[in-house]
Amino acid sequence: MCSVHYNHSLAAMSGSDIMAYSLSLEQKTAFAFVGMLLVFLGLLIVRCFRILLDPYSSMPSSSWGDGLEGLEKGTFEYALT
């Protein structure tokens, strides 16, 4: 009643034909590039989730006025001289 048709090219190949089927250099390069992009995307996702879970750990603990010597923090007299 119902016949099953396989349109996949690898399903019709014999075992020795499958071993002979190889990716071209362009396909290998494309797969390597996509793989590197996926690894980079994964690292960015992990970094973003770490920042979302603990946002204050990535901020520096010093403030802008730590480097001032002899002046009070919050005064802008040093900018006028």
Swiss-Prot record:
Membrane-spanning intervals of the chain: 29-49
InterPro entries registered for this protein in UniProt: Cortexin (IPR020066)
Cited Pfam families: Cortexin
Cellular component GO terms, alphabetical: membrane
Membrane topology, record value: Single-pass membrane protein
Keyword Metal-binding attributed: no
Subcellular location field: Membrane
Keywords: Membrane, Transmembrane, Transmembrane helix
Lineage top rank: taxon: Eukaryota
Main location: membrane
Similarity annotation: Belongs to the cortexin family.
Name the record gives this protein: Cortexin-2
Lineage, top ranks: Eukaryota, Metazoa, Chordata, Craniata, Vertebrata
